[in-house]
Amino acid sequence: MSKYKLIMLRHGEGAWNKENRFCSWVDQKLNSEGMEEARNCGKQLKALNFEFDLVFTSVLNRSIHTAWLILEELGQEWVPVESSWRLNERHYGALIGLNREKMALNHGEEQVRIWRRSYNVTPPPIEESHPYYHEIYSDRRYRVCDVPLDQLPRSESLKDVLERLLPYWNERIAPEVLRGKTVLISAHGNSSRALLKHLEGISDEDIINITLPTGVPILLELDENLRAVGPHQFLGDQEAIQAAIKKVEDQGKVKRAEK
């Protein structure tokens, strides 16, 4: 039986989402479409009469800005927002900045799908020579984390994401949900997938089939042990949501010329 409700989402679209590049820990901002997605998400939640007590985000701009726009649409700008690197997008290592379609051409669609969606495959780590290495690791936000800078990831599998996310869920977010607080988590595709895996008990093999579109609110109903009592629900126009999911899935494919 459902006792608690949790809303989570992947942030709105950013420039690198549109350019089909691995964004990861590079601090790309929302583009105009992403801002509109966030506002529409807020409108959807307002229509359903959601009143939030607390919002959790990553430390990346696109996650935080999405939360702000949602709260603005709700008229709930005063609601506290807490940010943690543990909700960051998966660290894609050496793949950061690369175009997914070009990667599919060079390595095959299945390999790119495994890098993007599998549970325990880790891409090659980022090196100091990588064009975005210093932009990431010289950023002040990573000097105030709960782990030393040299212990932050250089590449992650989805399993790694779940392992660094779970302490934050268990120690910070879950207690608020258990107190009856209505919580919004504005995160990323893979940190959201990792949390869904944990709460819904999705298998290591099946998680590869879970794809999340940008800017769509996800409702999870949880029991007294904070386990999902059913599958997650995308809130909104279901036909449009399925089209958005397909768009994300197609990012790792080679475009075929029409005959």
Swiss-Prot record:
PROSITE patterns, per the entry: PG_MUTASE
Chain coiled-coil ranges: none
Annotated catalytic residues: 11, 89
Pfam family, one: His_Phos_1
Class of the enzyme per the UniProt entry, highest EC level: isomerase
Ways its activity is controlled: At alkaline pH BPGM favors the synthase reaction; however, at lower pH the phosphatase reaction is dominant. Inhibited by citrate.
N-acetylserine sites (modified residues): 2
List of residues binding substrate: 10-17, 23-24, 62, 89-92, 100, 116-117, 189-190
Catalysis performed (reactions): (2R)-3-phospho-glyceroyl phosphate = (2R)-2,3-bisphosphoglycerate + H(+); (2R)-2-phosphoglycerate = (2R)-3-phosphoglycerate
Sequence positions bearing Phosphothreonine: 122
Keywords of the record: Acetylation, Glycolysis, Hydrolase, Isomerase, Phosphoprotein
EC number: 5.4.2.4, 5.4.2.11
Expression tissues: Expressed in red blood cells.
GO BP, one annotated term: neuroinflammatory response
MF terms (GO), sorted A to Z: bisphosphoglycerate mutase activity; hydrolase activity; phosphoglycerate mutase activity
CDD domains, per the entry: HP_PGM_like
Family according to the record: Belongs to the phosphoglycerate mutase family. BPG-dependent PGAM subfamily.
Subunit structure and binding partners: Homodimer.
Role according to the record: Plays a major role in regulating hemoglobin oxygen affinity by controlling the levels of its allosteric effector 2,3-bisphosphoglycerate (2,3-BPG). Also exhibits mutase (EC 5.4.2.11) activity.
Protein name: Bisphosphoglycerate mutase
Gene source species: Oryctolagus cuniculus (Rabbit)
